[in-house]
Amino acid sequence: MNIQDAQPSTLREMIKQGKLTGHTSGMAKGYVQANVVILPSKCAYDFLLFCFRNPKTCPLLDVSEKGNKSFTKYGVTADISTEVAAYRIYQYGELIETRANVDDLYTDDMVSFLIGCSFTFEHALLEAGIPIRHLEENHNVPMYVTNIPANPSGQFKGNITVSMRPMTMTQAIKATEITTRFKNVHGTPIHIGNPTEIGITDLALPDFGEPVTINENEVPVFWGCGVTPQSVALDAKPDLMITHAPGHMFITDIPDSQLSD
């Protein structure tokens, strides 16, 4: 089966059965992918505000009802506790485990958030002739924690995380124009060029994901990243926070075109 052209529900079922375990970049071409955050209800309001205050890094797509494992729009038949290829479990700000299923942790008190992912606009970039290096090299996209502070909300505070894609400056200008249409999945780049200006000292050592080749005629282009809540969790220290593992997204039933202005 060609996973690029597979239906989201088919891929989610394969993930649930343990038949798909890798990063999801390039899967279900033309459909929205989302970052995942699952929290106890007592933390939900502060995190909701955190998303609204930081739309470039945490563009909110959907929120579940308390205790509900599905979503009203982005996954009506989904089970958020079993249909993400890899989950991370944080307790009091410490990453304690990565696993394939969190059904036993999902209580009636949990609230789930879906946050826009830049994988969603990659298809539009490819159609415009802009290379996606991590796809070419079969890597997870490189992600870096910056020195740019997020706008805090309650216990949620810290610096934002970005994803990086190298390209020529001409392509970067075109990519900026294209991603202007995708405000619900991070929109335009946060930074283009010198990574030290945003606190990144070595592009070969990403905080999440894998490094990619950057050619001499290329510049790094940085977009806001929905992994930001995971770096923020180190400061927020909620009793329990469940997220997707970086690059292992929730594949929704919604076409990319519905998020393009």
From Swiss-Prot:
Residue runs in coiled coils: none
Gene3D superfamilies: PSTPO5379-like, PSTPO5379-like domain
Pfam family, one: D-Glu_cyclase
Enzyme class: lyase
Keyword field: Lyase
GO MF, one example: lyase activity
Enzyme Commission number(s) from the entry: 4.2.1.-
Family statement: Belongs to the D-glutamate cyclase family.
NCBIfam families in the record: PRK05463.1
PANTHER family (alphabetical): D-GLUTAMATE CYCLASE, MITOCHONDRIAL
HAMAP family on file: Hydro_lyase (MF_01830)
Protein known as: Putative hydro-lyase SSP0308
